[in-house]
């Protein structure tokens, strides 16, 4: 069986595309980058095109599934492997490797990742078992063992990444074997910027072979590598802060062992699926429509009106339930109502089709935690659920880029260099400053950058010698150069920043309604009162104590043990290197938000929740 040929862009071209966009961004911030030189006649289109992080999944199961059971077994899998080796998927290959102190991957890269080495040899008899503890119990660290019947299992997962094929494995947890689970590498930047040999995120299909198989009730595991989060606690803290207010994925820590070798501690995050829906809305028994909005710095899935062509929505919103025409029509209707309804009519029009209160909590969490992967910055990396009554619910998905202060990074040997770990500095990509004029509706949108283009350095900072920008989370001035900074980034991020960005209709349109804006600001202050060291500190201390030995011994980690200890310390200092700690973030951010007064003095008192 032959597959349709795919052209595979070499790794050096992907790196070159990144640097090409960085070079462009320095000089022409308001225009899209010029076309990348296409020496390959198949068309190397940069990281956002074929072969990049947002490339569509390559469907090959149907080509080799001779017994039509929906997966590849035995000789079917062997045949698919042989074909992929001859005709590789464009997303195959390890993460990017840094050059001389340069690229995003490997020692010497911008994050100064520690050198990797083989982990300790561990067997199931060496670890504690927790058979009665819930799957996401934060007081224990389970060990998850995988046995993969190939010596170079990383190369095997790389080969099948970007396809609909899972690599079969035997999983052992709490002394119980689970045969025939499926593995694949997951993530975009957490995969493409991490080299082979370092920790990469995994998705585990527990029911890959046996549809009835469950691990403590779960059919899927998401094991994350904590890319971009040296504290390792962002997902757990976001989940804990969000849980009293909206449906949010649970998270805890696990140790992963592959073919007898420890790969260190991972963050296990609950899957958004029918089981998640049934747990939070038991009356619907898991029914309804579900969408995932994949991560994309282009920020083009903000629930704004994209017209009448359903293809414009299908390219931005990934349906996870059965694709039905009526669900797409309802999603398009929601976008139409959000975008085109006058502010004075919007709440009444949305009431039957949107969980408004949940959406306001979602938006408040996004800003209070300074989520640099959030809706306010990128209009992506979130989930949508439409219940059987036709009401849409907006839910968090990616929680690992929150709770970051700006200013100098931890630095020091093995740590991030100073200037790292900045909070958002200027509006999100495509956004405008507060004083910038409204965009011309008849003018083509400008300032969009392809997926995986890199941010410009903060004003006054030069590019490093190797062409990579200083580390930071959306560092630098507004892309269009206009507008005041509205309180800067990090702990002084204005909760009303960017409300003139029509591409993020859920935010800009909801918060244009005075009564809804007032309710949103009340939620912001509620979260600020809850986000304190007295409330969250004991939990941080518990988790720090629990995983510190694992982090110290982890030979595949993406950041240093010293950074982990610094960021999770109980030190009350809010200056110098200690300013990067979670405690300092809570102190400074909560103080700013509790003292915050909106510039618009006409904000009406909040109405009672409907």
Where are these regions (language model features)?
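Phosphate/dinucleotide-binding and metal-coordinating scaffold of catalytic cores
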Residues: 26-60, 82-610
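Hydrophobic core positions in alpha-helical repeat/coiled-coil coupling domains, especially the HAMP
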Residues: 70-71, 146
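Acidic carboxylate motifs that coordinate Ca2+ or other divalent cations, activating on Asp/Glu
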Residues: 65-69, 373
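Amphipathic regulatory helices of Ca2+-sensor modules
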Residues: 71-87
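N-terminal secretory signal peptides that target proteins for export/translocation
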Residues: 1-6
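Extended interaction regions within the primary functional domain
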Residues: 54-57, 65, 76-77
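Bacterial N-terminal signal peptides
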Residues: 9-21
């Amino acid at each position: 069986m032959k597959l349709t040929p795919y052209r595979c862009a070499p790794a050096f071209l992907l790196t070159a595309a990144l640097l090409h966009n960085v070079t462009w961004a320095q000089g022409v911030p308001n225009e899209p980058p010029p076309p990348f030189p296409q020496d390959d006649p198949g068309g190397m289109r940069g990281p956002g095109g074929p072969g990049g992080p947002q490339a569509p999944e390559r469907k090959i199961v149907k080509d080799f599934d001779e017994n039509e059971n929906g997966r590849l077994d035995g000789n079917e899998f062997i045949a698919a492997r042989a074909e992929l080796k001859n005709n590789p998927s464009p997303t195959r290959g390890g993460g990017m490797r840094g050059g001389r102190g340069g690229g995003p991957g490997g020692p010497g890269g911008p994050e100064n990742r520690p050198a990797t080495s083989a982990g300790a040899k561990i067997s199931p008899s060496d670890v504690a078992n927790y058979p009665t503890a819930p799957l996401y119990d934060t007081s224990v660290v389970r060990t998850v063992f995988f046995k993969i019947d190939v010596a170079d299992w990383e190369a095997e997962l790389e080969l099948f990444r970007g396809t609909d094929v899972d690599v079969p494995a035997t999983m052992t947890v709490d002394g119980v074997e689970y045969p025939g689970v499926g593995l694949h590498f997951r993530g975009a930047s957490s995969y493409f910027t991490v080299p082979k040999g370092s920790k990469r995120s995994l998705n585990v299909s527990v029911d890959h072979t046996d549809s009835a198989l469950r691990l403590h009730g779960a059919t899927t595991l998401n094991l994350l590598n904590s890319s971009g989060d040296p504290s390792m606690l962002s997902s757990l803290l976001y989940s804990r802060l969000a849980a009293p207010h909206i449906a949010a994925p649970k998270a805890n820590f696990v140790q992963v062992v592959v073919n007898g070798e420890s790969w260190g501690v991972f963050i296990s995050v609950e899957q958004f699926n029918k089981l998640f829906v049934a747990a939070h809305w038991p009356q619907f028994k898991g029914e309804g429509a579900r969408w995932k909005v994949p991560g994309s710095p282009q920020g083009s899935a903000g629930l704004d009106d994209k017209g009448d062509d359903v293809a414009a929505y299908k390219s931005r919103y990934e349906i996870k339930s059965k694709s039905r025409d009526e669900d797409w029509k309802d999603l398009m209707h929601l976008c139409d109502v959000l975008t085109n309804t006058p502010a004075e009519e919007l709440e009444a029009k949305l009431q039957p089709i949107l969980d408004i209160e949940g959406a306001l909590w979602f938006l408040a969490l996004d800003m209070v935690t300074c989520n640099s992967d959030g809706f306010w910055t990128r209009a992506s990396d979130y989930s949508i659920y439409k219940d059987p009554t036709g009401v849409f619910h907006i839910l968090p998905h990616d929680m690992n880029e929150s709770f970051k202060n700006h200013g100098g990074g931890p630095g020091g040997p093995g740590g991030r260099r100073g200037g790292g770990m900045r909070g958002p500095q200027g509006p999100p990509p495509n956004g405008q400053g507060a004083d910038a004029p409204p965009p011309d509706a008849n003018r083509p949108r400008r300032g969009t950058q392809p997926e995986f283009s890199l941010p410009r350095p903060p004003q006054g900072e030069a590019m490093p010698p190797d062409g990579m920008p200083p580390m930071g989370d959306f560092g630098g001035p507004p892309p269009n150069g206009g507008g005041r900074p509205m309180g800067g980034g990090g702990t002084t991020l204005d909760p009303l920043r960017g409300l003139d960005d029509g591409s993020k209709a859920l935010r800009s349109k909801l918060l244009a309604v005075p009564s809804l804006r007032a309710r949103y600001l009340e939620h912001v202050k509620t979260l600020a009162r809850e986000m304190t060291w007295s409330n969250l500190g004991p939990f941080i201390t518990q988790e720090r104590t629990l995983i510190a030995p694992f982090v110290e011994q982890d030979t595949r980690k993406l950041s240093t043990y010293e950074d982990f200890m610094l960021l999770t310390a109980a030190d009350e200092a809010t200056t110098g290197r200690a300013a990067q700690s979670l405690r300092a973030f809570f102190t400074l951010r909560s103080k700013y938000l509790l003292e915050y007064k909106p510039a618009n003095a006409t904000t009406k008192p909040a109405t009672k929740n409907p």
